[in-house]
Regions:
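Extracellular carbohydrate recognition
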Residues: 180-187, 195-197, 210-227, 348-349
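Short beta-strands within extracellular/lumenal beta-sheet-rich domains
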Residues: 80-97, 185-191, 220
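Short, surface-exposed tryptophan/glycine-enriched loops
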Residues: 146-201
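Sec-dependent signal peptide cleavage junction
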Residues: 17-25
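Short beta-strand-plus-loop segments that form exposed binding edges in beta-rich domains
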Residues: 172-176, 205-214
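Feature responds to low-complexity, polar/acidic, surface-exposed segments characteristic
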Residues: 228-270, 276-328, 334-353, 361-378
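Extracellular carbohydrate-recognition regions
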Residues: 24-54
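Short carbohydrate-recognition loop motifs
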Residues: 65-83
Length: 378
C-alpha cells in the first residue's frame, strides 16, 4: 500500500520492535516496499520427499502486487494435492518483557483474484481456502508425523476450524467483485493474547488452510500491529470445561448430577458431557464448584484424561503432587504443557492463557494423530 495512513506510516524496523521501553501501547507496520521485512515462508500438511515441493508448486517471494499503485507484497502459491495444504509465513518479534502477557490487535490486507460463488475441485477456490492468523509464543516449525507428512507445531485447527494459536479469520473469496478474475484487496483483522517467551520473543504467523484441491495464490501486504501489556486472568473450573466443550462440539449430551449446577447454568451441557466422558468428576461429594479457580493439578488431570491417560514414564522423576494428579502432572511437564515450577505448586490457580495454550497443544497432537490415521485408512 502506497497511500499510507498516519498509523501505517509508523513503519518500524525490527530494531524498533526490540525496544524494551514500552508505553501503554506500541505499534508497528510492515509494508514490504523495500524487502520482505524478515518474514519466512512455511508450508505444512503435505508429505515430505524428493521433488514433492516442486510437485506441489510451492512458491514464495517478495513481488509486485498486480493492483494499480499497490507496490510490493509477499506472494504465496501452492497446488493442494493433499486436500489439506497450509501455506503461510511468520516473523519473529523480539524485545518484549520475558514472561509478560500481551494483548495484540493485528490488521492486514490480502490480494485475491477469486470471485464470489465459484466452485472447484474438492471445494470452492475461495470459500474453501481459509485465512488464519495468530501470534504465538513458540516459533512456527514444521515437524514430520509417523507417515512423513509435515505438520505445524502450533495449533491452527484444520481447514474451516481455527486453533488456539492461529484463529480463523475468513477465506479467499472476494467480498465484492469489481474486476472479475483480477486481484483485489480484502481486509482482515484479529486480536490475540500471548505471553512472551523466556527471551522476550513472540511470532506473528499468517496463512491459508486449503480444502480446494488445485492452485491457490495470494499476496499479503500492509500488516499493522498494536500491543500493550495486560494482566493474567484466572480461569474457573466451569469455564475450562465449557472451553473444551465449545471447541470440540461433541454430539453426545447428558445431564450432570452435581448439586451445585442448575439447568440454567451456562456450564450445564458442558458439565454433562465432561462427567459422562469422565474428564471431570467434581470434588467427590456431589459438588463441582464451577466458579472455583481451576488449579494446575486439576487442569493437568482434565487434559491428561482427554489425551487418553497415556502411560507415564517416571524415569526417577519426583514431583510433590496430590496422589490423584501425580501422573497427570508428570505427563504435563514431559509434554511441555506445564512448567516444572508450576508442577511443583499444583494447588495454585492456573491462568487462562496457560490453560488455553496447553489445551491447544493437546488438541493439535490429537488432530495430527487423526490426520495420520486417515492417510493410512481413508
Amino acid at each position: 500500500m502506497r497511500k499510507m495512513t498516519k498509523l501505517a506510516g509508523l513503519v518500524l524496523a525490527a530494531s524498533m520492535l526490540a525496544s524494551t521501553a514500552y508505553a501503554a501501547e506500541k505499534q508497528a507496520a510492515f509494508d514490504f516496499e523495500k524487502d520482505d521485512c524478515g518474514f519466512i515462508p512455511i508450508y505444512v500438511d503435505y508429505p515430505g520427499g524428493e521433488g514433492v515441493d516442486e510437485f506441489y508448486e510451492l512458491r514464495y517471494g517478495h513481488e509486485t502486487v498486480p493492483i494499480d499503485g499497490a507496490g510490493k507484497g509477499l506472494f504465496l502459491s501452492g497446488n493442494n494435492h493433499s486436500d489439506d495444504l497450509f501455506m503461510g509465513c511468520y516473523k519473529e518479534l523480539a524485545g518484549f518483557r520475558p514472561g509478560q502477557l500481551y494483548a495484540f490487535h493485528v490488521t492486514f490486507r490480502l490480494a485475491t483474484q477469486v470471485d464470489g460463488g465459484m466452485i472447484g475441485v474438492g471445494g470452492s477456490p475461495g470459500a474453501s481456502v481459509y485465512v488464519k492468523g495468530g501470534i504465538a509464543m513458540e516459533k512456527p516449525e514444521r515437524v514430520q508425523d509417523g507417515l512423513g507428512y509435515y505438520r505445524l507445531n502450533l495449533d491452527k485447527g484444520n481447514q474451516g476450524q481455527g486453533g488456539t494459536d492461529l484463529t480463523l479469520l475468513g477465506n479467499l473469496e472476494k467480498e465484492e467483485t469489481v474486476r472479475p478474475g483480477e486481484y483485489e484487496w480484502k481486509e482482515f483483522s484479529f486480536d490475540a493474547r500471548t505471553r512472551a517467551d523466556a527471551e522476550g520473543r513472540l511470532w506473528l504467523a499468517l496463512g491459508t488452510d486449503s480444502g480446494f484441491e488445485a492452485v491457490s495464490s495470494y499476496y499479503l501486504d500492509d500488516i499493522l500491529l498494536s500491543w500493550a501489556e495486560t494482566a493474567d486472568e484466572i480461569i474457573t473450573r466451569g469455564e475450562a470445561v465449557r472451553r473444551l466443550y465449545d471447541d470440540l462440539r461433541p454430539a453426545e449430551e447428558d445431564t450432570p448430577n452435581f448439586t451445585d449446577v442448575e439447568e440454567s447454568s451456562p456450564y450445564w451441557k458442558a458439565l454433562g458431557w465432561a462427567q459422562k466422558s469422565k474428564l471431570a468428576s467434581g470434588y467427590g461429594d456431589g459438588v463441582f464448584g464451577p466458579e472455583d479457580p481451576l488449579t494446575v493439578e486439576q487442569a493437568a488431570v482434565i487434559l491428561y484424561r482427554y489425551a487418553g491417560s497415556p502411560a507415564v514414564k517416571r524415569d526417577g522423576v519426583s514431583i510433590e503432587a496430590s496422589d490423584w494428579a501425580e501422573e497427570a502432572i508428570i505427563w504435563g511437564i514431559g509434554n511441555g504443557l506445564i512448567s516444572e515450577e508450576d508442577g511443583a505448586d499444583g494447588g495454585k490457580p492456573i491462568d487462562e492463557f496457560s490453560f488455553t495454550r496447553a489445551w491447544g497443544k493437546v488438541r493439535a497432537a490429537q488432530a495430527h494423530l487423526c490426520q495420520s490415521l486417515y492417510k493410512q485408512h481413508p
